[in-house]
Amino acid sequence: MATSSVSKGCFVFKPDFKKRKISVPIEDYFNNEELDSEDSKLRFETYRLLWQRIKSETEQLQEGLNENLFDNLVDFLQKSHSEFQKNSGNWGSQMRLREIPTAALILGVNVTDHDVIFRSLTETLHNNVTPYVVSLQAKDCPDVKHFLQKLTSELIDCCVDRNSKEEKNDKALRRTSYSMDSLSSWYSTVAQKTGPKMTSKKRATCSQWQSPPVVLILKNMESFSTKVLQDFIIISSQHLHEFPLILIFGIATSPVIIHRLLPHSVSSLLCIELFQSLSCKEHLTVVLDKLLLTPQFPFKLSKKALQVLTNIFLYHDFSIQNFIKGLKLSLLEHFYSQPLSVLCCDLSEAKKRINVFSVNQCEKIRRLPSFRRYVENQPLEKQVALLTNETFLKEETQSLLEDLHVYHINYFLVLRCLHNFTSSLPKYPLGRQIRELYCTCLEKKIWDSEEYESALQLLRMLAKDELMGILEQCVKVLNSSTEKQLSNTAQKIKGFLTQFQNLDDSKEEEDACGSQPKGLQKTDLYHLQKSLLEMKELRRTTKKPTKFEMLRENVINFIDNLVRDYLLPPEGQPLHEVVYFSAANTLREHLNAAPRIALHTALNNPYYYLKNEALKSEEGCIPSVAPDICIAYKLHLECSRLINLVDWSEAFATVVTAAEKMDTNSTVSEEMSEIIHARFIRAVSELELLGFIKPTKQKTDHVARLTWGGC
């Protein structure tokens, strides 16, 4: 198309037709040529079904954790609005009419989880309190005008059952200037006359109300402008008698932030009540307890993989949502990289799948390190059968999977019992949380550790009431399981409780040890001290333990035997690779990225990411065809704290000129030198933007280097 025209100054070019990018189904990623793709679709389907179960359990868990908090909030809102509806004529009631009911919701610093909580809270308030629930964020409210504009539009969107006349009123409200007067008049004409839809539960609780309240949720209150909050609260308090507003402050830090943002003259207009959500660590403990410390889900994490997820949670974001995403990534990586993960399902289904295993899949079982160790410990005849007979191998694999299932049932029951014993000990030698105890048990035989020995010594000093309380908790744990694997253990513990109850509470008389002195004899201090020490040693060696001490020792020995029998590390179990994900490094690379290392790698060795053969170079060499920023970066690594821009530019031009093989005497090279200079300026600007250099006032033609070392 010609672009030379006297009359035209703008030329239109139709874009080239591009083929629509074909989306690849996610299950096709399991068909990797580098990996064995046998049963890839079945593996993906197993992963999908298992994740749906975990996701459903997680959603139910979060609803249960927030249920108590939401119930308290609903009670507060209903009570506050009911008191507002009582038109008392006394002076105190008139003063309270200017106080806006406010709920300060302390959610913690895990801001990424707040959206889920606010969505659930909004739905709960819609169903139980009022249809007028609005959530605002600080980015949408830079001033009072935008604050009221956003509030008005959200309130209008909340009304879903209105006639055409009311819609005209809404359009008129949108066209008018946004103010609290117009909003109050709209509310009086629409909300009170329309009678919005209510559920039967809400109608029963709110039948005495003349009009439903307006609940305004301010997400992350710390982000709002102080002036905007102050002005809005003052204006709203003056219209509270005609616009029943209730505020909910979402606070991530501390309730003190309310008094820091609002002066006393403004905070006195609020009737504040605090509500505390469950702490992040307690939430994590519950999630681990329901998802990993249970035989309900066959998928498990190794010690290192679990530590990666918990460390990211504890030292980075405190986000339960990110922890669950990490768990999902672990599940996906396990089914993607482990061909035998097809057996990571319910026991009955796994047995059916083993029956149809091919020869290749049977060979994969034989190659498992845990199975090879198991074969080496078997008699010679059984070894030959396991290595040559496919039918016998399938039967033995089914038996081993069943043993692994029983192992997990007993493992988690005994783990909880041990946690009941050790969670209240001084200084918590085995950890305060069950996840700490679980990580220790995953790593090694816990009874070989010094912490375990110190815990047993402390347990041998427990009082009768403390010991009986712990044993009762253990009985509840063992009876909570539908399996009958440890039923004898529960009966044994009940027997210990019966023996404790039958003990005589009175102190037992101690037998007199040693002969009584015949008479008082004069002696010096040395011989007196020697005699007292001998008598003390004699009492210690000849003293008999009481019945309680003997029974307590029996209980501790019984628990010790349980731990040694059932808390064996999972790495010693045959076929543990089928259900345990242990690629902690892969998980760390995906979730705990190091941007500075990645940036250094990209600039220092562009071939690592671009995969261009021309970018390959020896260590310490600068490829002449590398991107400009890579050349400038590698040159700046050779400089000291201050970099001369002239020398840097000449070195850059030398490298680029070597790449393009230009003749320095030609006019083209002179023109190209300007282009090279512009390229250098752009590369330096990009390095400054990335934070590698900065201008300095020491020398005008120098820049200061900001980074040192390899990255």
From Swiss-Prot:
Q: Name one Pfam family in it.
A: ORC3_N
Q: Which InterPro entries match?
A: ORC3, ORC3_ins, ORC3_N, ORC_WH_C
Would you kindly state one Gene Ontology biological process term found in this protein's UniProt entry?
A: regulation of DNA replication
TM spans, by residue? none
What molecular function does GO assign, one term?
Answer: DNA replication origin binding
Q: Keywords in UniProt for this one? A: Chromosome, DNA replication, DNA-binding, Nucleus, Phosphoprotein, Ubl conjugation
Keyword DNA-binding carried by entry = yes
Post-translationally, this protein is described as follows, namely: Multi-mono-ubiquitinated by OBI1; ubiquitination is important for efficient DNA replication origin site activation. Ubiquitination levels are low in mitotic and early G1-phAse cells and are induced in late G1-/early S-phase, peaking in S-phase and decrease toward the end of the cell cycle.
Q: What is its main location?
A: nucleus
Q: Where in the cell is it found?
A: Nucleus; Chromosome
GO cellular component terms given for this protein: chromatin; DNA replication preinitiation complex; nuclear origin of replication recognition complex; nuclear pre-replicative complex; origin recognition complex
- Subunit text: Component of ORC, a complex composed of at least 6 subunits: ORC1, ORC2, ORC3, ORC4, ORC5 and ORC6. ORC is regulated in a cell-cycle dependent manner. It is sequentially assembled at the exit from anaphase of mitosis and disassembled as cells enter S phase.
The record describes the protein's role as: Component of the origin recognition complex (ORC) that binds origins of replication. DNA-binding is ATP-dependent. The specific DNA sequences that define origins of replication have not been identified yet. ORC is required to assemble the pre-replication complex necessary to initiate DNA replication. Binds histone H3 and H4 trimethylation marks H3K9me3, H3K27me3 and H4K20me3.
Q: Which family does it belong to?
A: Belongs to the ORC3 family.
Protein name per UniProt: Origin recognition complex subunit 3
Q: Which species is this record about? A: Rattus norvegicus
